[in-house]
C-alpha cells in the first residue's frame, strides 16, 4: 500500500480504510441519552455527531455563528475548527431532526465549568471530558467534547496499521484537532 484512503473519525469511534469500515463503535443509546440529559439540566448546549450528520439546537448554532463572526479574536483549536467549518458552509441540522441515529460524539459549550459537574460525576468513568476554555471570547465559556473511553485516535490508527500490515512507525498522521 503505497497510497490509501483511510480516516480516523469521531476520535477513533469510526475508522475507515480502503473502503472498509474497521471500527464502528457509537455510544450506547442509554449512555448518550443519560449524559445528554445531565448536561442539558445545567443549561449546557450540545451538538450531536452521528455518522452522517450533526444536530444542534438553535442556541448552539447561534453561539458558533457568534464565534465565527469574531474571527479576529484568538481562538482555541476546537473553536477555530468550528469557525472554519461555519465559514466553509458546514450546516448543523436542527435538533428536532434527530431521530435517534447512533451518536459517536457530543460536543458542548457550557457557560461555566461547574455546569459540567453532574455529567462528570455520573459519566467520567465512560467518557473523557476534553475541555477548552473560551475565556478570551466571553465570560467563562468552556467548550469541548465527550470521547468514549472504549477508543481513542491512537486505537483508530492502530486498526488501520493492523489492516494494512504495517507498524505505527510507518505512519504519518494529520488532522483537524
Language-model segment annotations:
Residues 49, 53-174:
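Conserved acidic, metal-coordinating active-site core of Asp-based
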Amino acid at each position: 500500500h503505497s497510497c490509501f484512503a483511510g480516516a480516523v473519525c469521531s476520535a477513533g469511534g469510526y475508522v475507515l480504510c480502503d473502503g472498509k469500515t474497521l471500527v464502528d463503535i457509537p455510544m450506547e443509546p442509554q449512555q448518550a441519552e443519560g449524559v445528554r440529559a445531565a448536561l442539558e439540566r445545567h443549561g449546557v448546549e450540545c451538538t450531536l455527531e452521528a455518522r452522517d450528520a450533526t444536530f444542534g439546537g438553535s442556541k448552539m448554532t447561534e453561539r458558533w455563528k457568534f464565534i465565527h463572526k469574531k474571527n479576529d479574536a484568538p481562538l482555541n483549536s476546537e473553536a477555530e475548527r468550528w469557525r472554519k467549518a461555519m465559514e466553509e458552509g458546514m450546516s448543523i441540522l436542527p435538533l428536532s431532526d434527530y431521530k435517534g441515529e447512533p451518536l459517536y460524539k457530543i460536543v458542548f459549550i457550557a457557560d461555566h465549568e461547574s455546569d459540567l459537574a453532574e455529567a462528570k460525576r455520573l459519566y467520567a468513568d465512560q467518557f473523557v471530558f476534553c475541555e477548552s476554555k473560551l475565556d478570551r471570547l466571553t465570560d467563562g465559556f468552556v467548550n469541548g467534547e465527550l470521547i468514549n473511553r472504549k477508543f481513542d485516535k491512537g486505537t483508530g490508527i492502530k486498526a488501520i496499521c493492523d489492516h494494512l500490515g504495517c507498524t505505527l512507525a510507518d505512519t504519518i498522521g494529520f488532522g483537524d484537532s
